[in-house]
Amino acid sequence: MPIPLIDRETAEPQTLDEIRDWHHGIVDALVEQRASIQHAIRQSSAVAPRFVGMTEGEVDAHYDADRRELDRLTVLNLVASAEGTLKVDYFRRVAEKLKDSLSVAYRKWHKTLSAKKQLRPDFDDGGILDVLKKTQVMDNNIIGRYRECLRTRHWVGHGRYWSKPVEVDRLDPDDVYDRADALLRAMPA
């Protein structure tokens, strides 16, 4: 049964809290920079070349776009972090042959996969999340609320070349943090 080797020296997992703290720090910097540029424009002071000739409204539009992009990238990062944590847990349960119901279900499903899929199992439909849901080790609503974040993650992470899912504009980083955190906290030990 192939299990991928995880190189702990080159892996760079991020916790949800690290991602949230990074996001808050960048938001603070954007707010400060926006205020500084707005003040400079009002005072007719020098501004960075990219802001020369901009009105306050154009500066607002610029920083609104930056914030929107930051939020989307943060959502991607939060969802991917939770996915990574669940995959590491999945491989640990399969490799260590634990006896709890989730581990047994994971192993049973893992054995049905091709060698290639055993190394990179599906995550959402027909994958790890479905096995997790079927074992009923947590409230399935928690899984469902996390799944609602996946379309945004895929759209941002895969180049945005198809129509924007409605969730992109409905989900903010705090909501996604709460959903991902609830999922990880509900995982059995």
Language-model region placement:
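Short non-catalytic regulatory patches outside canonical folded cores
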Residues: 87-144, 163
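Surface-exposed polar/charged interaction patches
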Residues: 25, 29-36, 40-43, 47, ...
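Generic structural signal for well-ordered, non-membrane alpha-helices
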Residues: 46, 50-53, 80, 84, ...
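Short, hydrophobic, well-ordered secondary-structure elements
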Residues: 67-93
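Charge-enriched, short contiguous segments at helix-coil
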Residues: 133-189
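Charged alpha-helical initiation segments
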Residues: 1-72
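Generic structural signal for well-ordered, non-transmembrane alpha-helical segments
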Residues: 24, 28-31, 80, 147, ...
